[in-house]
């Protein structure tokens, strides 16, 4: 049920629109590159995102409607590639795809490697395109590969995805190191030296604690929300939120209804483990997809709405403070999204909801992108001091 709208709703809508246009709206996580690989053979001739794409949550017309000023495009490859020795090679293909996308649509996108790049590109009316890597399995235990990824534009890396790796435990798999191994700590320090943000979105609570203890620069959660609101292991507990505040980090809220709606979180709490079992029971890819789809149809996730999402922002602000929250939607990487946030055109609705809840223009700008820019600047400063 929609909550009652305040008096002067049209005036508030106009004010929200003005605030949104003035902000640098930065999203921490978009999986469009993997969708282009999966659905279009990595070809923008086959999937021209300058045109509306009904199979996607992301295309250029809707990015413009959403007022995006900066986007982290994600280098994702399945965790299983770590077992076949193909993770790094496939990740490099995804880097190439992102660079080809930015070059092809150069009137819209421009690569950004620093916080100042983001500000400049936004001022020029383009969407600053940054790169995040989803999962430390992609470096195949090589610090040289990590540095190579940085040189290719990566400005954050998630320490794990859904599976535990040799040096870091995942939130959704069995523990192996009890957090970070000694080499895992070396990875974090090397990321600090390079100026690459440490992303804790998929890691276990123990890994979070270890990384926050070791890191000399702010960490981020590129697409995670508040555990106190929706109890899912992909979300962040209050004790960690307090540590993030001390660290200067940013929790960028995920929009996926299965992570932010309390009932949705209960349904998806064991989603990664369940999918691994389904794959074991159905080794044929088509059979697996059929079984997966049947389960989803039998267990629909409640959508929630913009307010459901902003409840997470409210909680993170309450526990960690206004300087430690941002947006990391996970478009084209997740399923059910809240009403009015079905695709990348919906960001202005968040600004309106924040304004209606009493957030100031200054604080809204922090949430929409200012906090992430500040964390990136601090990571750059730490790198500069260490000779990175």
Where are the regions that the model predicts?
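N-terminal hydrophobic targeting/anchoring segments and the immediately downstream early-domain regions
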Residues: 1-178, 231-388
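Alpha-helix-loop-beta-strand connector modules within alpha/beta enzyme cores
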Residues: 177-193, 211-221, 350
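Substrate-binding cleft of carbohydrate-active enzyme catalytic domains
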Residues: 187-200, 206-210, 240-246, 315
């Amino acid at each position: 049920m929609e909550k009652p709208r305040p008096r002067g709703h049209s005036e508030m809508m106009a004010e929200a629109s003005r605030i949104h246009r003035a902000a640098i709206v930065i999203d921490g996580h978009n999986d469009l590159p993997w969708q282009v690989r999966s659905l279009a053979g990595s070809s923008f001739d086959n999937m021209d995102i300058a045109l509306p794409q009904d199979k996607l949550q992301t295309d250029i017309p809707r990015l413009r409607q959403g007022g995006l000023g900066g986007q982290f495009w994600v280098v994702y490859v399945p965790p299983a590639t770590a077992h076949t020795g193909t993770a790094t090679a496939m990740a490099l293909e995804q880097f190439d795809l992102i660079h080809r996308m930015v070059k092809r649509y150069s009137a819209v996108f421009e690569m950004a490697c620093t916080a100042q790049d983001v500000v400049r590109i936004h001022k020029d009316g383009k969407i600053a395109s940054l790169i995040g890597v989803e999962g430390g399995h992609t470096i195949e235990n090589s610090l040289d590969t990590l540095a190579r990824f940085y040189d290719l534009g990566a400005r954050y890396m998630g320490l794990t995805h859904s599976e535990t790796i040799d040096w870091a435990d995942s939130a959704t798999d069995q523990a192996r190191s009890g957090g970070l191994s000694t080499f895992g700590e070396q990875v974090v320090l090397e990321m600090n030296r390079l100026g690459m943000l440490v992303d804790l979105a998929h890691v276990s609570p123990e890994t979070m604690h270890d990384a926050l203890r070791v890191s000399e620069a702010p960490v981020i959660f590129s697409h995670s929300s508040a555990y106190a609101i929706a109890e899912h292991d992909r979300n962040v507990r209050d004790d960690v939120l307090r540590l993030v505040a001390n660290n200067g980090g940013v929790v960028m809220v995920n929009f996926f209804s299965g992570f932010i709606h309390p009932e949705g979180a209960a349904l998806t709490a064991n989603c990664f483990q369940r999918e691994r079992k389904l794959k074991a029971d159905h080794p044929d890819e088509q059979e697996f997809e059929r079984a997966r789809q049947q389960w989803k149809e039998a267990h629909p996730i409640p959508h929630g709405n913009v307010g459901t999402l902003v409840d997470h922002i409210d909680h993170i602000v309450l526990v960690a403070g206004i300087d430690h929250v941002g947006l990391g939607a996970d478009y084209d990487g997740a399923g059910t999204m809240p009403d009015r946030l079905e695709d990348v055109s919906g960001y202005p609705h968040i600004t309106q909801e924040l304004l209606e809840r009493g957030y100031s223009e200054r604080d809204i700008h922090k949430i929409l992108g200012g906090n992430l820019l500040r964390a990136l600047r601090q990571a750059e400063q730490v790198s500069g001091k260490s000779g990175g």
